[in-house]
């Protein structure tokens, strides 16, 4: 694993860094020659590593100390080269920013250039020697131990690619030892789907989720019951992990007919299997399918005879594979983690010997948190505790403190170790591995904002911008991690885009250990040990870092710094940093305005997030020429210096700020903007009273794609001409241009909405959010081209306004927030393309929906605690419906009615409850404190099959919409199966509109599986 990450690092990062140096400096020929030598040598080293990695893992039974040392050598070398290049860039950037000298500028510049070239030449000679020495050492010592892979978790890595033995469910070791706890509802629903007579054609049921959640165990339970029942003429269980489609088909044929050898090619095997299954009712389980191509090759073997009712169950860890498997006549079942009660029951069952059954159990809260409801983790940890004499042996707290060590070395935890290693090693390329390890920068249970995370990845250089021609952009990298269920969504926005996420408990432990072992991230948490060289530093815990803690630590090489809590004077001495690219001080308690002077000298900084007591940004922020993202939402900054808008690389500016009228004066910034040099794409946002000079600057921001404005009244602010002209220019429809997404959010407080009533067409927006008093729909809304997402918030919506909305033929998402709605009928012709309808009301005045209306509706959200029953809404008419969300305050009778209606719907849509925790009306609400409130308040009301209502702790299914990042446009709905949870918030929570933040918690009424429709 370590070798793969290092190999990818050299191949992907180094050429780009050298190219950057050539662009920045006028290098001597000798220096360029040394660079060429290093590139060629490193390519040879990469080739040697790749060849070594290609050796079959099964030959490496144990870690090789020699190979481990080689990897350490090469890692140190790679880091040294990066440090060298970044150091040169740092010195060059510092020199460019110096404004004056006693010597003439040309003479001084020439002298500095010579010094830089000389220093670089010396560094390259040193690195050249390091390369030669590393190569010689590898040649001297690796010949005796070919194919050995010394790396963290190496034995697990060697074994992880070994396929599980060809087996039936009864002999599969994972299933044989499985403990089915807390799966009654899942099992009942799965058996019901297998027994259901409609449809009679072949049905595929996909069970998807992170490794170790019990997918195989659940499938095995159903398989064993069905094979005993005699309802199927043919049945077979095959394991697809690490096998080609031909191998899977061959095994399947042998399971169906023992007389067959299954040695043909894939095409012939498909023919043979079809002949065996033709005109017969069969039940097949394919465990652990890993690619869509694998499924495409396998599925053609199954006859689709009608009126027979055959069933196929597949399990997979990859969401897109599950969607492909059940894309037609299928159901998708997303595995959930166990709740606290079931987790504790399973852990105690495995950990506590029977003779201690009446003994008071030790406190297991800490280890339960680490296991995070993952059955495999609970089982293996329980077995470890029992093997070590629990409850009289090591307690859970001791295990938690040394969990990294035990995961790496203890044989009892081998199954858990193999699962974690597999998820890491299966990621294609080094970039994804680096992106995953970056999650180690954040504390456990910390909700991570997706957009913020992507901007950090970009600043670090792990991935490329979406607009680049790179094979892996930032969004694609995040989507891969989500698709593989390695990270989980916490909050999903209007357009089904993840807004916040986190890693699972055991995966978090694995990431933490890998980050430390490879010196990828250094943690300072409760006075832990620090290495000599630190490149990414994360501080969290109660320990303040002082000078004694950091003796001998070189902070000049740090690329990313994240602080949660107090940092101390040593860490906040920014004169010690040189190569810093990412600086996150949102949660730094002892940050103040005095620190900004040195922060403005961090010339390589690309991402800056401020909080704490920061109240004023200095003009020197103009020195940060490489800055791409500036986030002051959690700071006290009210006035944004105009110099910020002159930053040439700035793309994202986030906060709630004003500018003075002095902006109208001719300045260098205005001259810079007038030349079209601004790269600003996100401005969310600024507060305007209609007369501020910022509106004059907007006309030059030609790349702006997301704009958020708070419109407030003040004395003398009666002329809104500037605001109207600025908005008019922003929404201008340039039909010949490739506009892409464009989002506008307007919040009117104490002022008239007349500024937008006179906007004229042609205009283009993909997303629009309006909050204010709207007796009528602003005329420009109906003429917007490309509008797919619309959110409106007002006291009351009139019939005329609602009827005008229904004519928006391209609208895909509609959200209405009000006290009440006037009488309104959604007719068959209204909202022809609507996918999601969200209505948030104080009074249950929901519209009447004609039968046949909203033909493509996927998600219906009716958020009113006084909702009574079904309110005459016939959900059976919505053929593609997948999810219904209700206010958690509705009566039990209403919940029961919706669950019953959902169970009778052909798609079995989810029924979710949204529970709100009101917070103060503030744009800077602490997301983490809100998250804790949600977790403590959340419960799930589960309607068990054939049983009474149960109340289950529901920490695992929740939603948080803190209103900090607006959603982008809903581009398209590829399928209706991949809807993780409810999309929005409750009761005057209106994305990015400055309303009271509300933290809703989602709980599910698991009436059935999530269907996949096309």
UniProtKB/Swiss-Prot annotation:
LRR repeats lie at residues 484-506, 507-530, 531-552, 580-602, 603-624, 625-647, 701-725, 762-784, 785-807, 808-833, 854-877. GO terms for biological process: defense response to other organism. SUPFAM superfamilies: L domain-like, P-loop containing nucleoside triphosphate hydrolases. Disulfide bonds: none annotated. Keywords: ATP-binding, Coiled coil, Leucine-rich repeat, Nucleotide-binding, Plant defense, Repeat. Residues 1-182 are annotated as: Structured coiled coil (CC) domain. Residues 189-466 form the NB-ARC domain. Belongs to the disease resistance NB-LRR family. Probable disease resistance protein. Resistance proteins guard the plant against pathogens that contain an appropriate avirulence protein via an indirect interaction with this avirulence protein. That triggers a defense system including the hypersensitive response, which restricts the pathogen growth. At the opposite of cultivars Aichi asahi and Sasanishiki, the cultivars Nipponbare, Mokoto and Hitomebore don't recognize the effector avirulence protein AVR-Pia from M.oryzae. PANTHER family: DISEASE RESISTANCE PROTEIN RGA4, DISEASE RESISTANCE PROTEIN RP. This is Disease resistance protein RGA4. The gene is RGA4.
């Amino acid at each position: 694993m370590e070798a793969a990450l290092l190999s990818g690092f050299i191949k992907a990062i180094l050429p780009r860094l050298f190219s950057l140096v050539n662009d920045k400096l006028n290098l001597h020929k000798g220096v360029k020659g040394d660079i060429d030598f290093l590139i060629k040598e490193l390519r040879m080293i990469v080739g040697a590593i790749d060849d070594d990695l290609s050796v079959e893992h099964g030959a490496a039974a144990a870690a090789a100390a020699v190979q481990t040392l080689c990897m350490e050598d090469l890692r140190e070398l790679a880091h040294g080269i990066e440090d060298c290049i970044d150091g040169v860039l740092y010195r060059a950037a510092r020199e460019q920013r110096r404004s004056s000298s006693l010597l003439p500028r040309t003479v001084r510049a020439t002298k500095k250039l010579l010094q830089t070239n000389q220093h670089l030449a010396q560094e390259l000679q040193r690195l050249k020697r390091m390369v030669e020495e590393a190569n010689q050492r590898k040649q001297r010592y690796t010949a005796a131990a070919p194919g050995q892979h010394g790396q963290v978790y190496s034995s697990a890595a060697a074994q992880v690619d070994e396929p599980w033995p060809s087996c039936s469910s009864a002999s599969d070791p994972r299933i044989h030892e499985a403990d089915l706890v807390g799966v009654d509802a899942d099992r009942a629903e799965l058996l019901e789907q297998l027994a259901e007579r409609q449809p009679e054609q072949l049905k595929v049921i996909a069970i998807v989720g992170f490794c170790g959640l019990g997918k195989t165990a659940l499938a095995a339970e159903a398989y064993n019951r069905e094979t005993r029942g005699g309802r199927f003429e043919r049945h077979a269980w095959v394991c697809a992990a690490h096998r080609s489609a031909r191998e899977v088909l061959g095994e399947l044929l042998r399971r169906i007919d023992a007389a067959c050898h299954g040695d043909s090619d894939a095409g012939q095997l498909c023919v043979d299997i079809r002949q065996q299954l033709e005109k017969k009712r069969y039940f097949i389980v394919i465990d652990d399918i890993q690619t869509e191509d694998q499924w495409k090759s396998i599925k053609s073997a199954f006859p689709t005879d009608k009126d027979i009712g055959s069933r196929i169950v597949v399990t997979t860890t990859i969401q897109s594979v599950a969607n492909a498997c059940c894309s037609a006549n299928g159901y998708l079942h997303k595995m959930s983690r166990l709740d606290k009660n079931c987790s504790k029951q399973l852990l105690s069952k495995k950990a506590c010997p029977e003779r201690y059954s009446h003994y008071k159990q030790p406190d297991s809260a800490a280890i339960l948190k680490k296991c995070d409801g993952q059955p495999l983790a609970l089982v293996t940890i329980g077995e470890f505790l029992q093997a070590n004499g629990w409850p009289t042996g090591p307690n859970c707290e001791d295990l938690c403190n040394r969990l990294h060590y035990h995961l790496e070395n203890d044989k009892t935890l081998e199954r858990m170790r193999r699962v974690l290693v597999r998820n890491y090693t299966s990621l294609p390329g080094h970039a994804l591995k680096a992106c995953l390890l970056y999650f180690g920068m954040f504390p456990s249970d910390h909700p991570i904002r997706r957009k913020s995370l992507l901007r950090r990845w970009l600043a670090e250089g792990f991935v490329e911008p979406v607009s680049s021609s790179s094979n892996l952009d930032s969004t694609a990298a995040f989507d891969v991690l989500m698709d593989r269920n390695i990270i989980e969504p916490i909050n999903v926005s209007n357009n089904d885009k993840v807004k916040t996420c986190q890693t699972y408990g055991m995966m978090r432990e694995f990431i933490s250990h890998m980050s430390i072992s490879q010196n990828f991230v250094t943690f300072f948490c409760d006075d832990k040990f620090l290495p000599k060289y630190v490149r990414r530093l994360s501080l969290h815990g109660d320990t303040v870092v002082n000078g004694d803690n950091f003796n001998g630590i070189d902070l000049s090489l740090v690329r990313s710094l994240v602080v949660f809590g107090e940092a101390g004077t040593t860490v906040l001495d920014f004169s010690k940093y040189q190569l810093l690219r990412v600086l996150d001080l949102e949660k730094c308690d002892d940050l103040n305005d005095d620190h900004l002077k040195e922060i403005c000298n961090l010339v390589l900084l690309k991402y800056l997030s401020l909080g704490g007591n920061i109240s004023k940004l200095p003009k020197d922020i103009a020195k940060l020429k490489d800055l791409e993202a500036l986030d002051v939402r959690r700071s006290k900054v009210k006035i944004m210096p105009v110099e910020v808008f002159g930053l040439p690389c700035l793309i994202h500016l986030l906060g709630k700020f004003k500018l003075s009228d002095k902006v109208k004066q001719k300045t260098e910034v205005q001259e810079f903007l007038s030349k079209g040099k601004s790269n600003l794409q996100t401005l969310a946002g600024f507060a305007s009273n209609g007369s501020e000079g910022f509106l004059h600057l907007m006309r030059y921001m030609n790349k702006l794609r997301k704009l958020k404005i708070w419109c407030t009244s003040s004395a003398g602010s009666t002329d809104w001409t500037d605001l109207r002209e600025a908005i008019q220019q922003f929404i201008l429809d340039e039909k010949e241009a490739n506009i892409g997404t464009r989002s506008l959010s307007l919040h009117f407080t104490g002022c008239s909405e007349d500024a937008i009533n006179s906007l004229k067409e042609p205009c283009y927006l993909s997303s629009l959010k309006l909050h204010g008093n709207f007796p009528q729909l602003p005329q420009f809304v109906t003429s917007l081209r490309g509008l797919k997402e619309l959110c409106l918030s007002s006291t009351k919506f009139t019939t005329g306004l609602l009827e005008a909305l229904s004519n928006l033929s391209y609208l895909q998402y509609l959200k209405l927030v009000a006290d009440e709605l006037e009488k309104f009928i959604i007719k068959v012709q209204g909202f022809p393309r609507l996918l999601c309808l969200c209505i948030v009301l104080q009074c249950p005045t929901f519209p009447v929906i004609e039968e046949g209306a909203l033909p493509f509706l996927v998600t219906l959200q009716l958020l009113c605690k006084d909702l009574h029953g079904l309110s005459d809404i016939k959900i059976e008419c919505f053929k593609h419906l997948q999810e219904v969300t209700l206010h958690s305050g509705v009566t039990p009778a209403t919940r029961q009615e919706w669950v019953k209606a959902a169970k009778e719907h052909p798609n079995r849509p989810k029924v979710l409850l949204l529970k709100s925790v009101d917070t103060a009306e503030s744009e800077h609400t602490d997301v983490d404190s809100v998250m804790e409130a949600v977790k403590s308040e959340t419960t799930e009301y589960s309607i068990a099959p054939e049983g009474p209502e149960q109340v289950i702790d529901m920490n695992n299914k929740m939603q948080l919409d803190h209103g900090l990042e607006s959603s982008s446009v809903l581009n398209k709905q590829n399928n209706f199966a991949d809807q993780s949870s409810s999309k929005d918030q409750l009761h005057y929570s209106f994305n990015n509109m400055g309303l009271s933040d509300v933290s809703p918690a989602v709980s599910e009424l698991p009436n059935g599986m999530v269907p996949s429709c096309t």
